[in-house]
Amino acid sequence: ADVVVAGGTDACLHPLALGAFARMRALSLRNDAPDLASRPFDQERDGFVMSEGAGMVVLERADFARARGAHVHATLSGAGVTSDAYDVTLPAVEGQTRAIGAALRDAGLTGADIDHVNAHATGTPVGDVTEARAVREAVGLHPAVTACKSATGHLLGASGAVEAVFTVLTLVHGLIPPVRNLEKASDGIELDLVSGGPRRASARAALSTSFGFGGHNVVLAFTR
């Protein structure tokens, strides 16, 4: 196809869904301070905040877009997908690292080419540390890293699409949003985390990571 509309939407705020994730101890317990509850990578994080939303993108073949004079925001240069089936809830760094590596190879990039990573980072104690290790191993310590769920919460099935849009807008505007509520990074998270406010950056290549329960790992590589 010359044009594809792709995205995700989720309306998950229902007692059954909330009860299920609460039973798995995946949700934050900061009910008395909801504005401080979503805090990816922070040493005081205790789970994610469930939310709802939607995000959509229009993907076009490059030659088709040029022929019709479309304004191209960015290029989806590569994608990597793995399914490690390591555990229902616990992430596996190997599967995440392979997904990042596959996206880089598909895009014809190396870790050194990546300026920015929009991390999946939900704010769970184990998940954030695992992802930080995967990013370090597959990309390195140099990219500026943010975690949009600190502001949006976890949109579940819509999070990947929404964060892909965030990543593209970062490339377009040269402005990386900060990780909200990040006061002190947890031990084991040795990344260049954007905090305190937006950071100006002329990023040319960025990754958007999505690492779901059950070992479903997807990484998108965008360039501009």
Functional labels for PLM-detected ranges:
Residues D32-L109, D115-H116:
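Condensing-enzyme catalytic core mediating Claisen C-C bond formation in acyl metabolism
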Residues V4-T9, H71-A79, A112-A119, A144-S150, ...:
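Beta-strand segments within the central parallel beta-sheet cores of soluble alpha/beta enzyme folds
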